[in-house]
C-alpha cells in the first residue's frame, strides 16, 4: 500500500506542529474503498436499476488502512524537543458484512460502518442506526411526527419501520467502480494530553459522517451523498479531527480541508452517567447562588439550560453564559465550534439539541399544573393560588387588607366622602378612589410608575390573582396577561416585502436545492405561510408553521436571518382552557368548543366583543343617582349610589337614587338657643338673643357667657344663665374684689386657731390638722384631746389610763407590754422546756395546759407518765391471749389458732382457708368493694394468685405479704399453687395449679386470650395491642407516638393499628413506613412466591431479608435459606406455647399442656398454631418434616394440670439430663455443642452464666416513668407492679390513681 504511506508521510510535518503544542498526535489514514454496491426494485423502471434503485444491499466491500504517526514532546531545563516515529500499519477488509469492522490500537479504537445514518443518527451496528427522538426509520430519514417528509424531502421513500417502499435509494458508490478506479482518503487525527498517574474515566467516542462522493437527485427522492460512518474511541481528554487528504477522482479532488471538527473541551469531559446536583434560581450579591435550591437533584444541563442560574453539588457555581449563535433549519440541529443550545434545550448529541422537560424537574409548578412547551414551560395555578416569586410554585393568595376608600382629598390633605364599602387598595385606587386607608394614603397618579404597579391594566380594571398565567418565552422572558378580556389574539403579519423583509437565505425559503459540501451542513426547507404572535413588549417573536410544526424565535433589533432559531418539532396536544382555568370567563360560564372557548355571561354582565371574557354593564352612564347628589359606583352585575352629605340613599322601583335629607326633622339639631331651616343638601341654624352660632360639626347655638365681661357684676359674683346672667353677693369667707369677682379670706394668716395643730386654708373657710393624741372639734376650727381609753381598742388584757395627748397600759398576770406599748401580749409559757415533760404543751391566753398522749396521765401538772393497762385491768386479752404493756398502749399475744384483731387489743379465731368468699384485686382502692375479681373462692385460691384481699360484703382480710411467714403458711408452694388435702401421695398433700383463667374469667385478660401456665397465666393480645398488668386488659398501642411509622404523612391511630394519610400523588409504603412519590415507591420483593423458600420474606426499603425456619439458616447474602454445613452452625430452636386451635380471625385457643415446644414439635403433634403471634402450622402432609414414628406424648405431666407432690423443677431435671449444665432458677436447654441455661421472663443470666437473677425493671426500665407514670414502681420476682403514691388509690373501672376518700 504505497499510496496511503505516502499520504501519511505528507502529513507528518503537520502532526509535528501539533506535537509542538504539547499534545500527542495520532494520525490514522482511512482508505475507504466500496465496491459493487447495487440492487434493484421489483416493478421499478429499467432505467433506474442501473443507478442502484432501492433494493436491499446485495454485497459490500470496504478496505481501511491505518498508518499511525506517533509524536511526543520532551522538555528539559526549559528547552522542549519534538520527536515522531512511524507506527505499524493495520489493515481492515470487510466483505458481505461478515468481517470485523473494528480495529483497536494503543489508547484508541476505530469503528467503520458503511450504513448512512441521516439527521444526526449514529450507526450502532452494521445494520442499525441509533436515531434522535424526532426521527425514525432504518436510516433516521423519517420524522417522528409523520411518515413522510423530513430531510430527505417528501414523496416515495422508506417507511417508518425501515422497510423499503416504492422509490429508489441511490447506492453508496456508482456501480461497477473498482478499488483502483475511485476512492477517497481521509485522515482521522486524535490529539490527547499525556496520561496522568492512575486510570482515568472510561473512553469516549466520536462519530463522523464521511462523504464518499456526490449524491444523486431525482424528482421523487432527495438522497444524501454516499457516506460512511466512522467512530473513533479515544481517551476522554482527547479531541478528534477529520481531514480530507486526497481523492483518486480528478473531478472531486480537493486540497486538504477541515471536516466535522470535534473541538477539545476546555475542561475534562463528564462521565457517561452525568452527576446530579442542586439547582438554584436566585443569586446573592456576593455569592453565586441563594440559600433555597429547588427540591430534588437535577443534571447541570437541565438546570442551566432552563430555569436555573446556578448549580452545584458540594459547592455552588454560576451557570455559564450561553454561546448560542443560532441553529439552522429543521432536521439535524448542527452548531458551530463552541456553540450552545438555545434556552430551554440541551444537547442530545454532537448534532442535535433536545427540548428540556421542565415539568419533570422536581419543584417546578408545585401546587399547580405544569405544561411543557418547546423550549419553555407554563404554570397554571388553581383558583385561590398565584405564582410565587420563584415562578416555580403556586402559593395560596393572602387576603388583602380592606379599609375605607375616599372619593376626595381636600387641599389641606384631609380625606372626604368615604365609600360605604371597605375595599382593597388596588380595587380603590384602580376605580374611583383618591385616597385609601385609615391614614389617608393617597392613590398614585394615573400614568405614573406607581400607578402601573398596582393597576397594570389601567383605570377600571384590577388583577384577579387566580387567573394569572405565566408563560416563559425564550431567554427567561415572562409575559403576564392582565387584559380584562383575556390574552390578546395573534395578529397576522403582512407578507409583502415592504413590510416584512425576507431572510438572507432566499434559496432555502423558495425550496431550491443546492449540492453543497457536507462541511457546510445545509439542508432543504420548503416555504409555508407563517402566522406570528406579536407580544406587547419587545420579546423574541414566536413564529409557528403549520407543517412541519416548528417554532422560530427572533431576538429584538436583529435581522430574522441572524437571530432565527429553529427547534426540532415537538408534539403539542390541544389544551382545554376551561378545565385548566376554571374562572377564565369571570362572571360567566366557559363553554369549550373548536377552535377555542366562548363565554356565556351572568345577568348584569355582557360579553366582550371578542367573546373571551364577561365584562360588567356600566349602569352609571345614565346617572341613576341624580346629578350632583352622589357618586355612582358600578359593581359586578349592578351599581351602588354613594350619596353626598345632605342626601340619603333611596331604593325604589326605579332603582337606587339620592334624595334630600331633611336634617331639621331631627329634634334639637341647633340646640335650645336656635331653630333649624332646611335647604336642598344642607341646613342652617338661626340663634335667639343671648346665643351665638358655634363653629362645630354640626353647628349649634351656644349660650353667650356674659360673666366673662368684668363690668357685668362690679360689686358681687356674676352667675351666667342660659341667654342671660345674674349678680350675687359674696359668700361668708369671701370678700369682693370688684369687677364682679369674690376673693377668699385666709383665716390661717390672721391668727392660730388650731393649736396644738396646723391650720390649712380652704376656699371660703379653713381646716385644722391636729397633732397625735388630739382631734378636730366638731366645727373643725380647734383641736381637743382624745381619750384613747374610751375607744376600747387599746390596752387589751390590761388597764388603760388616759393622759394629755396619749395613754398608759397596766398588764394583767400572764401578759407583758408590747413594744409599741399600745396593748398587752400573752406570755408563751410553752417556750420553757420544763413546762410539760412527756406531753404536748398548749399555750392559752394568760396561761397554758399540758396534754398527755393516749396511755399516759398528768402528774404534778407538768409531767406525763405511762399508764399500765395490763395492771389496771387483768381481764384484757382473755380468754385466748395474754396482755403485754407497751409505752402508751398494750398488745395481745394470742394463743395458737388465734390471731390478733386489727387493733391488736383482742384475739380472734383464724379463718379456715377452705371457706369460700370474695377475692378483691386492690385493697387500697377507695372503691375497693367494686374491685372483686371472683366470688366463691377460697383464701388460698385468692391470696396465692392475684388477690390482695379476701372476705365478704366489703369486710376484707388483707392477704399476707409475699415471702412472709404468714404467706408461706397459707401458700407453701408459692404463687400459683394451692393445696388439696383430699388427695395425698405417700402422705404428702397434693398441689394443684391455680387456673387463673378459669377462676377469674375475663377479669384478668380483657380483649385477649388467657392461657393458664404452671404457675401463673399469660394474656395474649392481638397484633397492635399490649397487655397492661395494672388494668389487666389488652390496651391498644398508639403507633402514632412513634414518628417513624408515618413519615411525610398524617398518622391516625386505629384499634389494633394505624392509618397513614399521604398527600397525593404520594402513597404509603408499609415497608419504609413513610409516604413516597410513585418514583420512590419500594418494590416488594416478597411478592415473589419463590423468595426465601423455605422461610419467611421480610421486605426492606430497597431490599429484603429472609427469616429462615430451623434448621435452615440465612445465606451469606441474607436473601435465601440454606442448610448449615455442620450441626454446630445450625441456629438454636426457640420454644413457645403450642395451640390446639386456630380460628379464622387469626386468634389461637386451647394451649397444649406441658412445657413449651419448638415449631416443628408443636406442628408435628396436634398443634394448629405456635407462639405468641399464633403462627399457623402448615397443612398435614404438605412438605412436613415430621418423623413418622413421632406421636403425641401421653405422660401424666403433659396432659394433666394436677401435680401430685412437688412439681418437677427445671433445674433438677436439667442436672439429671446433663452433668455439664448448671442452671439455678432456670432450665437447661440442649443445643448443638452443649446445653445452655435459659431463664424465664423477668430474669436474666448473671456473670457465671449458670444462675438466673431477677431483673429490677423499676431501676433499669422505669427511666422517665416509662413503666409507671405518676406512680411508684415496686419490683417483684420476675416482674414489677405500679403502686399508687400516698393519699391515692387505684380506680377499678379505669385503673388510674385517684385521691383517696376519707371515711
Curated annotation (Swiss-Prot):
Q: Which InterPro entries match?
A: cEGF (IPR026823), EGF-like_Ca-bd_dom (IPR001881), EGF-like_CS (IPR013032), EGF-like_dom (IPR000742), EGF-type_Asp/Asn_hydroxyl_site (IPR000152), EGF_Ca-bd_CS (IPR018097), Growth_fac_rcpt_cys_sf (IPR009030), NOTCH1_EGF-like (IPR049883)
* Entry GO terms, CC: collagen-containing extracellular matrix; extracellular exosome; extracellular region
Looking at the record, the residues that make up the EGF-like domain are: 109-141, 355-395, 574-615, 616-659, 660-702, 744-784, 785-825, 826-865, 866-908, 993-1035, 1036-1076, 1082-1122, 1254-1298
What tissue specificity is annotated for this entry? Answer: Isoform 2: Expressed prominently in heart, skeletal muscle, prostate, testis, small intestine and ovary. Isoform 1: Strongly expressed in pancreas and liver.
Q: Which Pfam families match?
A: cEGF, EGF_CA, hEGF, TB
| Low complexity: compositionally biased ranges | 529-540
Region Disordered, annotated ranges: 247-282, 478-552, 1188-1219
Q: Give a short account of what the protein does.
A: Key regulator of transforming growth factor beta (TGFB1, TGFB2 and TGFB3) that controls TGF-beta activation by maintaining it in a latent state during storage in extracellular space. Associates specifically via disulfide bonds with the Latency-associated peptide (LAP), which is the regulatory chain of TGF-beta, and regulates integrin-dependent activation of TGF-beta.
Task: Report quaternary structure and partners.
Answer: Forms part of the large latent transforming growth factor beta precursor complex; removal is essential for activation of complex. Interacts with EFEMP2.
Identification of the protein by name: Latent-transforming growth factor beta-binding protein 3
PANTHER family tied to this protein:
FIBRILLIN-3, VON WILLEBRAND FACTOR C AND EGF DOMAIN-CONTAINING PROTEIN
Report keywords, A-Z: Amelogenesis imperfecta, Disease variant, Disulfide bond, Dwarfism, EGF-like domain, Extracellular matrix, Glycoprotein, Growth factor binding, Repeat, Secreted, Signal
Q: Locate the TB domain: which residues?
A: 277-331, 403-455, 917-971, 1136-1186
**According to the UniProt entry, which disease involves this protein?**
Dental anomalies and short stature: A disorder characterized by hypoplastic amelogenesis imperfecta, significant short stature, brachyolmia-like anomalies including platyspondyly with short pedicles, narrow intervertebral and interpedicular distances, rectangular-shaped vertebrae with posterior scalloping and herniation of the nuclei, and broad femoral necks. Dental anomalies include widely spaced, small, yellow teeth, oligodontia, and severely reduced to absent enamel.
* Main location as per UniProt: secreted
What compartments host this protein?
Secreted; Secreted, Extracellular space, Extracellular matrix
Task: Indicate which residues are glycosylated according to the record.
Answer: 89, 349, 845, 936, 1275
Protein modification: Contains hydroxylated asparagine residues. Two intrachain disulfide bonds from the TB3 domain are rearranged upon TGFB1 binding, and form interchain bonds with TGFB1 propeptide, anchoring it to the extracellular matrix.
What is a GO molecular function of this protein?
A: transforming growth factor beta binding
Name the residue ranges with Polar residues bias.
Answer: 1188-1198
Amino acid at each position: 500500500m504505497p499510496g496511503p504511506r505516502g499520504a501519511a508521510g505528507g502529513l507528518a510535518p503537520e502532526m509535528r506542529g501539533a506535537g509542538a503544542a504539547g499534545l500527542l498526535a495520532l494520525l490514522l489514514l482511512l482508505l475507504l474503498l466500496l465496491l459493487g454496491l447495487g440492487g434493484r426494485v421489483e416493478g421499478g423502471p429499467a432505467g433506474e436499476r442501473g443507478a442502484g434503485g432501492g433494493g436491499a444491499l446485495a454485497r459490500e466491500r470496504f478496505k481501511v488502512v491505518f498508518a499511525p504517526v506517533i509524536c511526543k514532546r520532551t522538555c528539559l531545563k526549559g528547552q522542549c524537543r519534538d520527536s515522531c516515529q512511524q507506527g505499524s500499519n493495520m489493515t481492515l477488509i470487510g466483505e458481505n458484512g461478515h468481517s470485523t469492522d473494528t480495529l483497536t490500537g494503543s489508547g484508541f479504537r476505530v469503528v467503520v460502518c458503511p450504513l448512512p445514518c441521516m439527521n444526526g443518527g449514529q450507526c450502532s451496528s452494521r445494520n442499525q442506526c441509533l436515531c434522535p427522538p424526532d426521527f425514525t426509520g432504518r436510516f433516521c430519514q423519517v420524522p417522528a411526527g409523520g411518515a413522510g417528509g423530513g430531510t430527505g424531502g417528501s414523496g416515495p421513500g422508506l417507511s417508518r419501520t425501515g422497510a423499503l417502499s416504492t422509490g429508489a435509494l441511490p447506492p453508496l458508490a456508482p456501480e461497477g467502480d473498482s478499488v483502483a478506479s475511485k476512492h477517497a482518503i481521509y485522515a482521522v487525527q486524535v490529539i490527547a494530553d499525556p496520561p496522568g498517574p492512575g486510570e482515568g474515566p472510561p473512553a469516549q467516542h466520536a462519530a463522523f459522517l464521511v462523504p464518499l462522493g456526490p449524491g444523486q437527485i431525482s424528482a421523487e427522492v432527495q438522497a444524501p451523498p454516499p457516506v460512511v460512518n466512522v467512530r473513533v474511541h479515544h481517551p476522554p481528554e482527547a479531541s478528534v479531527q477529520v481531514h480530507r487528504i486526497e481523492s483518486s477522482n480528478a473531478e472531486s479532488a480537493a486540497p486538504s480541508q477541515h471536516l466535522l471538527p470535534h473541538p477539545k473541551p476546555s475542561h475534562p469531559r463528564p462521565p457517561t452517567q452525568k452527576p446530579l446536583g442542586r439547582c438554584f434560581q436566585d443569586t446573592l450579591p456576593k455569592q453565586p447562588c441563594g440559600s433555597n435550591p429547588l427540591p430534588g437533584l437535577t443534571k447541570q444541563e437541565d438546570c442551566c439550560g432552563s430555569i436555573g442560574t446556578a448549580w452545584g453539588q458540594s459547592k455552588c457555581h454560576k451557570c455559564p453564559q450561553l454561546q448560542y449563535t443560532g441553529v439552522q433549519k429543521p432536521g439535524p440541529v448542527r452548531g458551530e465550534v463552541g456553540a450552545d443550545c438555545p434556552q430551554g434545550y440541551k444537547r442530545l448529541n454532537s448534532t442535535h439539541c433536545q427540548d428540556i422537560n421542565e415539568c419533570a424537574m422536581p419543584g417546578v409548578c408545585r401546587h399547580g399544573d405544569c405544561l411543557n412547551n418547546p423550549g419553555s414551560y407554563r404554570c397554571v395555578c388553581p383558583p385561590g393560588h398565584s405564582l410565587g416569586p420563584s415562578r416555580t410554585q403556586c402559593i395560596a393568595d393572602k387576603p388583602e387588607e380592606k379599609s375605607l376608600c375616599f372619593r376626595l382629598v381636600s387641599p389641606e390633605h384631609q380625606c372626604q366622602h368615604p365609600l360605604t364599602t371597605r375595599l382593597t387598595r388596588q380595587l380603590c385606587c384602580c376605580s374611583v378612589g383618591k385616597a385609601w386607608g385609615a391614614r389617608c394614603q393617597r392613590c398614585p397618579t394615573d400614568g405614573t410608575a406607581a400607578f402601573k404597579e398596582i393597576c397594570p391594566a389601567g383605570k377600571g380594571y384590577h388583577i384577579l390573582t387566580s387567573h394569572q398565567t405565566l408563560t416563559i418565552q425564550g431567554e427567561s422572558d415572562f409575559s403576564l396577561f392582565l387584559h380584562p378580556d383575556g390574552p390578546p389574539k395573534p395578529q397576522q403579519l403582512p407578507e409583502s416585502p415592504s413590510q416584512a423583509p425576507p431572510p438572507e437565505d432566499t434559496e432555502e425559503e423558495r425550496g431550491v436545492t443546492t449540492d453543497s459540501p457536507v462541511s457546510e451542513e445545509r439542508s432543504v426547507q420548503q416555504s409555508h405561510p407563517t402566522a406570528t404572535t406579536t407580544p406587547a413588549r419587545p420579546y423574541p417573536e414566536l413564529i409557528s408553521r403549520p407543517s412541519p410544526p416548528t417554532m422560530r424565535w427572533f431576538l429584538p433589533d436583529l435581522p430574522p436571518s441572524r437571530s432565527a432559531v429553529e427547534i426540532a418539532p415537538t408534539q403539542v396536544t390541544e389544551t382545554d382552557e376551561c378545565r385548566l382555568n376554571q374562572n377564565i370567563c369571570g362572571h360567566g360560564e366557559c363553554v369549550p368548543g373548536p377552535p377555542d372557548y366562548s363565554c356565556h355571561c351572568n345577568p348584569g354582565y355582557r360579553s366582550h366583543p371578542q367573546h373571551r371574557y364577561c365584562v360588567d354593564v356600566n349602569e352609571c352612564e345614565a346617572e341613576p343617582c341624580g346629578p350632583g347628589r352622589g357618586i355612582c359606583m358600578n359593581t359586578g352585575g349592578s351599581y351602588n349610589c354613594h350619596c353626598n352629605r345632605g342626601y340619603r340613599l333611596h331604593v325604589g322601583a326605579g332603582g337606587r337614587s339620592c334624595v334630600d335629607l331633611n336634617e331639621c326633622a331631627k329634634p334639637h339639631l341647633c340646640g335650645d338657643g336656635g331653630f333649624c331651616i332646611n335647604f336642598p343638601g344642607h341646613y342652617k341654624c338661626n340663634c335667639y338673643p343671648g346665643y351665638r352660632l358655634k363653629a362645630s360639626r354640626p353647628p349649634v347655638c351656644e349660650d353667650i357667657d356674659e360673666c366673662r365681661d368684668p363690668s357685668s357684676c362690679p360689686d358681687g359674683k356674676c352667675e351666667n344663665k342660659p341667654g342671660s346672667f345674674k349678680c350675687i353677693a359674696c359668700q361668708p369667707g369671701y370678700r369682693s374684689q370688684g369687677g364682679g369677682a369674690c376673693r377668699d379670706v385666709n383665716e390661717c394668716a390672721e391668727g392660730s386657731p388650731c393649736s396644738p395643730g396646723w391650720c390649712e386654708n380652704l376656699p371660703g373657710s379653713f381646716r385644722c390638722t391636729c397633732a397625735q393624741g388630739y382631734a378636730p372639734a366638731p366645727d373643725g376650727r380647734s383641736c381637743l384631746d382624745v381619750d384613747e381609753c374610751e375607744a376600747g381598742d387599746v390596752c387589751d388584757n390590761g388597764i388603760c389610763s388616759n393622759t394629755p395627748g396619749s395613754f398608759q397600759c397596766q398588764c394583767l398576770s400572764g401578759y407583758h407590754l408590747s413594744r409599741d406599748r399600745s396593748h398587752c401580749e400573752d406570755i408563751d409559757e410553752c417556750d420553757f422546756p420544763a413546762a410539760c415533760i412527756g406531753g404536748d404543751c398548749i399555750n392559752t391566753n394568760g396561761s397554758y395546759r399540758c396534754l398527755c398522749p393516749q396511755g399516759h396521765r398528768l402528774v404534778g401538772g407538768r409531767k406525763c407518765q405511762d399508764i399500765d393497762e395490763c395492771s389496771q385491768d387483768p381481764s384484757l386479752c382473755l380468754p385466748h391471749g395474754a396482755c403485754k404493756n407497751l409505752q402508751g398502749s398494750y398488745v395481745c399475744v394470742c394463743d395458737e389458732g388465734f390471731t390478733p384483731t386489727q387493733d391488736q387489743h383482742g384475739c380472734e379465731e383464724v379463718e379456715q382457708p377452705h371457706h369460700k368468699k370474695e377475692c378483691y384485686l386492690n385493697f387500697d382502692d377507695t372503691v375497693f368493694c367494686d374491685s372483686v375479681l371472683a366470688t366463691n373462692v377460697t383464701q388460698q385460691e385468692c391470696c396465692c394468685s392475684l388477690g390482695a384481699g379476701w372476705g365478704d360484703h366489703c369486710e376484707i382480710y388483707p392477704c399476707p405479704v409475699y415471702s412472709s411467714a404468714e404467706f408461706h403458711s397459707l401458700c407453701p408452694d408459692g404463687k400459683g399453687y394451692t393445696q388439696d388435702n383430699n388427695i395425698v401421695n405417700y402422705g404428702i398433700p397434693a398441689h394443684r395449679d391455680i387456673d387463673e383463667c378459669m377462676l377469674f374469667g375475663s377479669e384478668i385478660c380483657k380483649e385477649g386470650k388467657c392461657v393458664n401456665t404452671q404457675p401463673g397465666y399469660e394474656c395474649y393480645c392481638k397484633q397492635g395491642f399490649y397487655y397492661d398488668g395494672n388494668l389487666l386488659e389488652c390496651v391498644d398501642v398508639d403507633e402514632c407516638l412513634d414518628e417513624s411509622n408515618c413519615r411525610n404523612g398524617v398518622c391516625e391511630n386505629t384499634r389494633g393499628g394505624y392509618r397513614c394519610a399521604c398527600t397525593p400523588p404520594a402513597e404509603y409504603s408499609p415497608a419504609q413506613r413513610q409516604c413516597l412519590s410513585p418514583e420512590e415507591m419500594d418494590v416488594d420483593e416478597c411478592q415473589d412466591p419463590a423468595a426465601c423458600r423455605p422461610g419467611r420474606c421480610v421486605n426492606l426499603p430497597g431490599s429484603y431479608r429472609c427469616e429462615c425456619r430451623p434448621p435452615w439458616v440465612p445465606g451469606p447474602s441474607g436473601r435465601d435459606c440454606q442448610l448449615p454445613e455442620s450441626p454446630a452452625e445450625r441456629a438454636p430452636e426457640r420454644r413457645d406455647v403450642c395451640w390446639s386451635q386456630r380460628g379464622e380471625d387469626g386468634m389461637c385457643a386451647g394451649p397444649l399442656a406441658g412445657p413449651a415446644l419448638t415449631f416443628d414439635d408443636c406442628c408435628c403433634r396436634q398443634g394448629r398454631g405456635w407462639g405468641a403471634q399464633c403462627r399457623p402450622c402448615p397443612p398435614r402432609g404438605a412438605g412436613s418434616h415430621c418423623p413418622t414414628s413421632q406421636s403425641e406424648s401421653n405422660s401424666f405431666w403433659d396432659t394433666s394440670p394436677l401435680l401430685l407432690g412437688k412439681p418437677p423443677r427445671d433445674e433438677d431435671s436439667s442436672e439429671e439430663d446433663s452433668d455439664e449444665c448448671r442452671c439455678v432458677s432456670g432450665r437447661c436447654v440442649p443445643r448443638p455443642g452443649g446445653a445452655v441455661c435459659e431463664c424465664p421472663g423477668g430474669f436474666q443470666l448473671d456473670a457465671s452464666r449458670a444462675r438466673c437473677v431477677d431483673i429490677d425493671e423499676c431501676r433499669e426500665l422505669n427511666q422517665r416513668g416509662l413503666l409507671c407514670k405518676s406512680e411508684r414502681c415496686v419490683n417483684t420476682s420476675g416482674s414489677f407492679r405500679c403502686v399508687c403514691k400516698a393519699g391515692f388509690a387505684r380506680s377499678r373501672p379505669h385503673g388510674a390513681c385517684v385521691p383517696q376518700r376519707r371515711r
